[in-house]
Swiss-Prot record:
One of its GO terms (cellular component) is small ribosomal subunit. Keywords: Ribonucleoprotein, Ribosomal protein, RNA-binding, rRNA-binding. GO terms for molecular function: small ribosomal subunit rRNA binding; structural constituent of ribosome. One of its GO terms (biological process) is translation. Pfam families: Ribosomal_S20p (PF01649). HAMAP family: Ribosomal_bS20 (MF_00500). It comes from the Bacteria. This is Small ribosomal subunit protein bS20. Residues 7-22 have a biased composition (Basic residues).
Length: 88
């Protein structure tokens, strides 16, 4: 544990940021799961609506550095691919 006051403050801030980032990543995963569950159910309209909501969230997480931009692109690409397969 830190002894210097500034180090204690840094530790508090880091823990606070970790919890916030963790909740943001969890939220993103929830949006992705909504799309996946709609696709599995075969509900095209609900899947498209969930996808439209999930994409900006995924992009925001990449912009903020919570996930890598390539991971964001991979998520969006795979979800979109599943949506296209659902239609045809």
């Amino acid at each position: 544990m830190a002894n210097i006051p500034s180090a204690k403050k840094r530790a508090r801030q880091a823990e606070k940021r970790r919890k916030h980032n963790q909740s943001q990543r969890s939220m993103m995963r929830t949006y992705i799961k909504r799309v996946v569950n709609a696709i599995k159910a075969g509900d095209k309209a609900q899947a498209e609506e969930a996808y439209k909501v999930a994409v900006p969230v995924i992009d925001r997480m990449a912009t903020r550095g919570l996930i890598h931009k390539n991971k964001a692109a991979r998520h969006k690409s795979r979800l979109n691919q599943h949506l296209r397969n659902l239609q045809g």
